[in-house]
Amino acid sequence: MSEHPRDTPQFYLTAPSPCPYLPGREERKVFTHLVGDKAASLNDVLTQGGFRRSQSIAYRPACEGCKACVSVRICVDDFTPGRSFRRVQADNSDLIGQIKPATPTSEQYALFRSYVTGRHGTGGMADMSVLDYAMMVEDTHVHTRLVEYRKRGPDSRIIPRGTGDLMAVALTDVLTDGLSMVYSFYNPQVHDRSLGTFLILDHITRARQMGLPYVYLGYWVQGSRKMDYKRRYLPQERLTPHGWERVEK
């Protein structure tokens, strides 16, 4: 039996399961483990190749006869918010995001429970316990952080922190070429703020300030209404069999 070096990634294929995005379809994924000293560099390479991270696993779709899942990344330097995006930024100008280590809290979990119950109903993520949530946040061997969003405090111009209730949270990986938004959640009762849109816009701003060219959004799934929002952030690049291709409109 041949042996592989410990730091050489091994890839595996999942069994078929129902597709969560397209009714009547089945999905399969190819995945590997992100562990060890080279986990961060491997995560960089795999993300650039269309993989996503979930805890210490990197995966990408490997479905037979279906190519609906397309990796999308926003071109930060050339992105200019249109009128609707500027309105969202204005509506949330009273919020401030504070970077936190990838450490779960009970306050985060309470907001997460409210979000998944309101958005996803039952099953899947709605069944996640506090331990499951903790694993989602802290089971990482790469450069992962949280951004917590609250209303600005009276001294936020001097000390960048907010006060009051937690409004939104973004779990984000910092890559060599961008920010990868792993998972985000927010107060589902606040409809007029478009908080999901605001989190993406804020990460575009953060990536630009860090000198990073991309914000990775994961997969746009052609034919899935709940994933269609990812097409709005232009210009963007979509991963094809021929590499990343720029989309302007």
From Swiss-Prot:
The keyword Cytoplasm applies. It catalyses: N-terminal L-glutamyl-[protein] + L-leucyl-tRNA(Leu) = N-terminal L-leucyl-L-glutamyl-[protein] + tRNA(Leu) + H(+); N-terminal L-aspartyl-[protein] + L-leucyl-tRNA(Leu) = N-terminal L-leucyl-L-aspartyl-[protein] + tRNA(Leu) + H(+). InterPro entries: Acyl_CoA_acyltransferase, Asp_Glu_LeuTrfase, N-end_Aminoacyl_Trfase, N-end_Aminoacyl_Trfase_C, N-end_Aminoacyl_Trfase_N. Signal peptide: none annotated. It is found in: Cytoplasm. It holds the Pfam family ATE_N. Its EC number is 2.3.2.29. Keywords: Acyltransferase, Cytoplasm, Transferase. One of its GO terms (cellular component) is cytoplasm. GO terms for biological process: ubiquitin-dependent protein catabolic process via the N-end rule pathway. Transmembrane segments: none annotated. GO terms for molecular function: arginyl-tRNA--protein transferase activity; leucyl-tRNA--protein transferase activity. The keyword Repeat does not apply. HAMAP family: Bpt. Belongs to the R-transferase family. Bpt subfamily. Functions in the N-end rule pathway of protein degradation where it conjugates Leu from its aminoacyl-tRNA to the N-termini of proteins containing an N-terminal aspartate or glutamate. This is Aspartate/glutamate leucyltransferase. It comes from Xanthobacter autotrophicus (strain ATCC BAA-1158 / Py2).
